Amino acid sequence: MAKQPTRARKRVRKQVADGVAHIHASFNNTIVTITDRQGNALAWATAGGSGFRGSRKSTPFAAQVAAERCGEMAKEYGVKNLEVMVKGPGPGRESTIRALNAAGYRITNIVDATPIPHNGCRPPKKRRV
């Protein structure tokens, strides 16, 4: 008996008007994730995944390209308004927000959620070049 070919159902994309852009800007890379209000990820992009390797990965331009890519993916879900949460001290903090603004999103709120230790772990030793 021949097996019936099972067809995968076309996935219905939910429409979300308001989203949250989580920007994690480390010294080495920038990760941009756009979620809905509940925290379910809709789209994400990184500077490294956008084609930048090595020291170019940690530049503001690489963060800008990652934000543009993430913004294009989130447009498919109908996101129009973004609340921005920035974490980390990296060089891509400001350029990411500018790129999201230029991509046509209305930025409603910007929150700096950088984790600051209350004298927690010992920091890495200073570089001697």
From Swiss-Prot:
Protein name per the record: Small ribosomal subunit protein uS11
NCBIfam families: PRK05309.1, uS11_bact
Record function comment: Located on the platform of the 30S subunit, it bridges several disparate RNA helices of the 16S rRNA. Forms part of the Shine-Dalgarno cleft in the 70S ribosome.
Subunit structure: Part of the 30S ribosomal subunit. Interacts with proteins S7 and S18. Binds to IF-3.
Similarity annotation: Belongs to the universal ribosomal protein uS11 family.
Keywords: Ribonucleoprotein, Ribosomal protein, RNA-binding, rRNA-binding
GO cellular component terms, semicolon-separated: ribonucleoprotein complex; ribosome
One GO BP: translation
Pfam families, sorted: Ribosomal_S11 (PF00411)
Entry keyword 4Fe-4S: no
Highest taxon of source: Bacteria
